[in-house]
Amino acid sequence: DQVTAENLTAMKERFADALALFPPGYHFDVIGYGCTSASLLIGEDTVQAIVKSHVNVNNVTTPLTGARRALKAVGARNIGFLAPYISEISEKMCFLLEDDGFEI
């Protein structure tokens, strides 16, 4: 498959299948969903809600969540952005970071 916004968004439909692979009844402190671009398109809150609805976990994170929090924690204002994503994804990511108050 090609990397497209449509294919990345469709990952949401397979979360339940993937999450069913975790040991039933096991409690996790944190689960990380490792697809930055899908997290952007699906939405960080939606990713967290889906994971928490299928797995006993305290926290859910994504690379996007971590990057946003880290940039805020170090007081970043002006950031350079380099990413291996298709332009549609890169633009959306830049818009999100700008909405967070960063200058790109």
Segments the model singles out, each with a brief description of its role:
Residues Q48-L71:
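Short, acidic/small-residue loops that bind anionic groups at enzyme active sites
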Residues C35-D45, P84-I89:
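Gly/Ser/Thr-rich loops at beta-strand to alpha-helix junctions
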Residues D1, Y26, Y33, A67-R69, ...:
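Ligand-binding pocket scaffold of soluble enzyme catalytic domains
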Residues L40-K52, C94:
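Short Gly/Thr/Asp-enriched flexible loops that form oxyanion-binding sites at enzyme active sites
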Residues A18-H27:
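Phosphate/pyrophosphate-binding loops at sites that engage ATP/ADP/AMP, CoA/4′-phosphopantetheine
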Residues D1-D17, L82, E88-I104:
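N-terminal glycine-rich anion-binding loop in soluble enzyme alpha/beta folds
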